[in-house]
Amino acid sequence: MRICTWNINSVRIRLDQVMRLLSEHQPDILCLQEIKVANELFPENLGEELGYHHRLIHGQKAYHGVAILSRLPFVKAEPRYWCGKEDSRHAWASVKGSDGKPVELHNFYVPAGGDVPDPEAN
């Protein structure tokens, strides 16, 4: 299983680069961080023509946000929240590995700082 991850810093301004990465490297799964777009504005067909039919988008307007694009069907997938915040920083998905056993995938965006200098609060 080939997995790529990319802190993209705004998916909508890098659509051509995403398509080039998917075409040239052909990962089974692509994890994106800092997509900086609300779920409903995520590029609807991104990667579809290359077989990336399974997706979990956990975005928010202007900052943060993570996405998982996959050729492999999800057994289960859901957004997660941390530290009592509604920031879109974590997406979790499970896919079947080549041996048929589930593989858990956690896509995190972890900013360098936070509102207060406390790891438990951020």
What is the role of each PLM region?
Residues 34-117:
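Structured beta-strand-rich core segments of catalytic domains in phosphoester-bond hydrolases
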Residues 118-122:
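Short, intrinsically disordered, charge-balanced linker/junction segments flanking boundaries
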Residues 1-50, 63-66:
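N-terminal, active-site-proximal structural segment of metallo-dependent hydrolase catalytic domains
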